[in-house]
Structures are given as C-alpha cells and as structure tokens.
Amino acid sequence: MAELRALVAVKRVIDYAVKIRVKPDRTGVVTDGVKHSMNPFCEIAVEEAVRLKEKKLVKEVIAVSCGPAQCQETIRTALAMGADRGIHVEVPPAEAERLGPLQVARVLAKLAEKEKVDLVLLGKQAIDDDCNQTGQMTAGFLDWPQGTFASQVTLEGDKLKVEREIDGGLETLRLKLPAVVTADLRLNEPRYATLPNIMKAKKKKIEVIKPGDLGVDLTSKLSVISVEDPPQRTAGVKVETTEDLVAKLKEIGRI
C-alpha cells in the first residue's frame, strides 16, 4: 500500500477575511491588490493527503493548481505543509477569472491519468464560487468512484473507507481505488507550516505546464451577465398587536 500516489487540487482564492468589492462594470469582483490565500477546504485536503503519507499509506503527494502565475504561491504553501512536488497549470489572469468547475475537472482528470495516481483529493467546494462541483465532475471524467463531503478517510486494503455526515446520521462508503474524495470541514484540522518547512518548500519542484499540453480546451461555455452586491437590508420595526402587524404589512404592500 506504500505505492499509492495522491493528487491534491489547491485553489487560490481571495482571503476569507477580506471584504469583497464588486467591480464598477459589474463583470466580477476586484482581485488586484487584494490578499489571496489557499481555499480553506483545499488546506484540509492537503492535510489529509500528508497524514496518509505520514502513515506510510501514500508514497507521494502532488499538489496542483490551475490559474495565473500567483498560483505558485498557493502550491508552495501545500509543499510547506508536506506535499512532495507541485504542478502549475498556467492560465492567463483574464482567462483564469472565467475558469469554472468543468474546465478545472478536465485538467484534474488528465493530470490524474498522466501521473497515474490512485487518489484525487480536493476540497468539497471553494469559498469564492461555492460551486461544489469540481470533485464530482472529475470523478465523472475518470469514471472513478467518489466520496464527497468526507469527514473521515481510512485505507482498508485496496479500498478506501469514507465516512460522511448526512441529514440525520452518518453514511459510510467503501470505494475501490482509484477514487476521488472531497474534504469536509470535519475531516481534520490543517497544520501551520513551520519556518523550516517553508524554507524547504522553496527547493521543491514545481512543474509549469499549459492546458494545451494536456489536450484540454479551457474555453468556458458560460458567460457572466452581471455581478452585484446583495441588496441592503432595511431596519425592522416592532409592533404591539396583531392588528398593528396586519396594518404594517398592508402599508408595505405585502398583503
């Protein structure tokens, strides 16, 4: 079992602590000069892959990111956490803004085949678009079994036991490898990269390739019509009686 190899997808997103601003032309959100970091769910996926390696269940952990040159910073973070090497699928910034789950899933599927990995790990969703689609699409392209929203992952021989929380209970899946797993928040607590590991990460290899090298066309089939801030909420009012409530609702045109 020590010969297993894992591919972990990591996405560069606007940091969760940053207040999002919409562009004046409403074509997207402002990203220039804004702090970015690794998607929190991706951090959990990296942590799980590294833990499997520390248990000698996985031989190699490969971190991959698809996007502009700055994505290499995100890959370096994964390398500092314990990934062995990185792959950067370089996409120009303007094109990267239009990347959707379908295009990224095509890239991940091709890389999984090229690298002959046994396990693809990724966050269940990204905090920027909240799509929750990439893992499922990747499994579909590869025709591999999938375990989504994983809260616990255990290797049992040639199968992967995945526990996932569902409404009213816990569901257990046993996936025959190779497989795709998406990480839930409850899967683990990601480690902080230590300074020595950050320094070591600078010496680890990051291979830079183009989507065309994988035979993938990243042309999006979707177009964004408009991006807008949510409407401002108005302050509520207190009423003393049911009659006052009915009168107020009539006043604002709700009844």
Swiss-Prot record:
This is Electron transfer flavoprotein subunit beta. PANTHER family: ELECTRON TRANSFER FLAVOPROTEIN BETA-SUBUNIT, ELECTRON TRANSFER FLAVOPROTEIN SUBUNIT BETA. GO terms for cellular component: mitochondrial matrix. AMP binds at residues 9, 39-42, 66, 123-134. GO terms for molecular function: electron transfer activity; nucleotide binding. It is found in: Mitochondrion matrix. Heterodimeric electron transfer flavoprotein that accepts electrons from several mitochondrial dehydrogenases, including acyl-CoA dehydrogenases, glutaryl-CoA and sarcosine dehydrogenase. It transfers the electrons to the main mitochondrial respiratory chain via ETF-ubiquinone oxidoreductase. Required for normal mitochondrial fatty acid oxidation and normal amino acid metabolism. ETFB binds an AMP molecule that probably has a purely structural role. The modification N6-methyllysine is found at residue 200. Keywords: Acetylation, Electron transport, Methylation, Mitochondrion, Nucleotide-binding, Phosphoprotein, Transport. Methylated. Trimethylation at Lys-200 and Lys-203 may negatively regulate the activity in electron transfer from acyl-CoA dehydrogenases. The keyword ATP-binding does not apply. The modification N6,N6,N6-trimethyllysine is found at residues 200, 203. Belongs to the ETF beta-subunit/FixA family. The modification N6-succinyllysine is found at residues 210, 248. The modification N6-acetyllysine is found at residues 200, 210, 238, 248. The recognition loop recognizes a hydrophobic patch at the surface of interacting dehydrogenases and acts as a static anchor at the interface. The modification Phosphoserine is found at residues 223, 226. Residues 183-205 are annotated as: Recognition loop. The keyword Nucleus does not apply. SMART domains: ETF. The modification N-acetylalanine is found at residue 2.
